[in-house]
């Protein structure tokens, strides 16, 4: 769900909720008039209109999750007929399918897939560029990031919502 400001955090852990509220409301030490911060905090307060939007969407959360899950299963079934790996939840975890991804065999396969899908009306994109490759972080220390680079060259984010019938455009292709 979205509230127009990036979403919301939901938990059934009271301690985690208290901690999250503290960090997201500037980490200010309680005091009647002084502003003292004892750690790095953020100003992520949610305006009432955004909160109302979030509350309305919460009433439909199960519906949203069912739609995302159905599409993820359609992707997984479609992709299962290929040699591409669909990224799935690990162990006993349950994915929300906000972002689906696949792993291709090479950078060349990734680029070919991106070109094919985007030119056929399904927007796909490579995973985010590594932070160490962004100008503002290029001089920061890293350990070579071998695994991250391997993934960057192969992982594609696929849509978590597509128009009905859009996946049928992609019949089996000749290898």
Regions found by a protein language model. Give the residues of each.
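Glycine-rich phosphate-binding loop of ATP-grasp-fold ATP-dependent ligases
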Residues: 4-9
């Amino acid at each position: 769900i979205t509230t127009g400001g990036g979403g919301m955090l939901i938990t059934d852990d009271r301690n985690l909720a208290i901690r999250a509220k503290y960090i997201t409301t500037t980490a200010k030490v309680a005091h009647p008039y002084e502003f003292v911060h004892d750690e790095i905090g953020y100003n992520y307060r949610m305006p009432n209109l955004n909160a109302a939007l979030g509350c309305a969407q919460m009433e439909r959360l199960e519906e949203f999750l069912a739609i995302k899950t159905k599409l993820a299963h359609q992707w997984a079934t479609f992709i299962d007929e290929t040699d591409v790996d669909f990224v799935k939840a690990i162990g006993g975890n349950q994915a929300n399918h906000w972002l689906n991804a696949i792993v291709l065999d090479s950078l060349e396969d990734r680029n070919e897939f991106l070109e094919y899908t985007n030119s056929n009306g399904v927007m796909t994109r490579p995973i985010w560029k590594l932070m160490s490759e962004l100008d503002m972080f290029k001089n920061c220390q890293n350990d070579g990031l071998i695994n991250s680079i391997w993934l960057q060259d192969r992982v594609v984010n696929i849509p978590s919502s597509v128009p009905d019938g859009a996946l049928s455009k992609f019949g089996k292709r000749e290898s």
